[in-house]
C-alpha cells in the first residue's frame, strides 16, 4: 500500500515535548522514517548498528517505549511473534499477517469500514478506535 501522506518530523515533535535527541535516537527515528515494513525491536537494532555499532538493544527498547508513549509509533503484538512497530501517522489501514512468512500487508477497504460502522451503530455504539488484523495463508497458485 502506498502511504499517501508526508511523514511527520518526529524529531521536531519530540524536541517540542522536551525530549533530547541523541545520536542513537536520531538513527532510530531515521530508520522508522525510511522503513516500509513493520520491524520488531531486534530488526531496528540490527539496522541501527549498521550506522553506529555503539547502539545497544536496550537503547532501542527505551527509544521505542518513549516514541510509543509520545504517540509517535504504534506497537502491534501480532499473534505468535514479537511486538512490531509502525509510525502512528497517516491514513487508517488494517493488516493482513501471512502466517507462514510473518509478512505484514497493509490494506484499506471502504466496504469494511462502512460495515463496521453499521454494526456498531446497530448495537448502539460509535467506533472510537479499532484495529483489524487478518491472519492468513497465501492461496496456492
Curated annotation (Swiss-Prot):
GO terms for molecular function: DNA-binding transcription factor activity; transcription cis-regulatory region binding; zinc ion binding. GO terms for biological process: negative regulation of DNA-templated transcription; regulation of secondary metabolite biosynthetic process. Coiled coil: none annotated. Fe cation binds at residues 92, 94, 113, 130. Pfam families: FUR (PF01475). Residues 90-141 are annotated as: Dimerization. One of its GO terms (cellular component) is cytosol. The keyword Zinc applies. It is found in: Cytoplasm. Its main location: cytoplasm. InterPro entries: FUR (IPR002481), Fur_C (IPR043135), WH-like_DNA-bd_sf (IPR036388), WH_DNA-bd_sf (IPR036390). Keywords: Cytoplasm, DNA-binding, Iron, Metal-binding, Repressor, Transcription, Transcription regulation, Zinc. SUPFAM superfamilies: Winged helix' DNA-binding domain (SSF46785). Zn(2+) binds at residues 38, 86, 95, 106. CDD domains: Fur_like. It comes from the Bacteria. The keyword Transcription applies. Residues 1-89 are annotated as: DNA-binding. Homodimer. Acts as a global negative controlling element, employing Fe(2+) as a cofactor to bind the operator of the repressed genes. Belongs to the Fur family. This is Ferric uptake regulation protein. It comes from Brucella abortus (strain 2308).
